[in-house]
Amino acid sequence: PRNQILHRRPLPPVGGAGLFGMAEGAVYLPPAALYPAARLAFSSAQHRIGATVVVMRHFDAEEALRIIEAQKVTTSQWVPTHFKRLLSLPEAVRKRYDVSSLRVAVHAAAPCPIAVKQAMIEWWGDAIQEYYAGTEGGGTLIRAQEWLTHKGSVGRHWSGGRVFILDEDGKPIDEPNREGAVYFEAPPDPKAR
């Protein structure tokens, strides 16, 4: 109807949105272009549930910190290269900005060097989370405190399923630091998927 304002609640979150701090009223920063699938999907999901999405035209480490402080960013998504560039800023610059509004700073897309992740946890604390996932579905999640006791891990299946690492013959790999193919098994309860 004309000249009527319809008030609607945001659509409910999809999938594991709650795992990554997605909620109505959140302020989400994807600190680079939206063409990678994960950043676009996270941005769309955040917008869909009523969050504010603040998009940077290109990544600039100090500008990202300025935006976090100015916009009171609560959730964000990073790659290890972003972390390296943030950490390469002079300490005085890093301390200039208040990033205490961050509740979730999730990272993925490439292995994060242990020293880099350790430094980010020391700086941003429990906000740091990492996920590992495949385009086909399934994934793992690890939060800062668990990672500190399992450095180098990408966590456990995010919805209670199982993760298998298999060698080229399809046999399970039990020892650490061996390459293999990663397989996800969905949890038995469809509500957990």
Protein language model features and the residues they cover:
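Adenylate-forming
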Residues: 2-18, 28, 65-67, 83-90, ...
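Conserved AMP-binding/adenylation subdomain of ANL enzymes
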Residues: 2-75, 89
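Solvent-exposed alpha-helices and their adjacent loops that cap or buttress functional pockets
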Residues: 19-23, 97-98, 155-157, 174-176
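Residues that mark the start of a beta-strand
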Residues: 26-27, 103, 181
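Thr-Gly-centered strand-to-loop micro-motif
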Residues: 30-31, 55-56, 106-108, 166-168, ...
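Gly/Ser/Thr-rich phosphate-binding loop
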Residues: 48-51, 73-78, 87-151, 158, ...
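Short beta->alpha linker loops
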Residues: 59-60, 81, 111
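AMP-binding/adenylate-forming core of the ANL superfamily
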Residues: 175-191
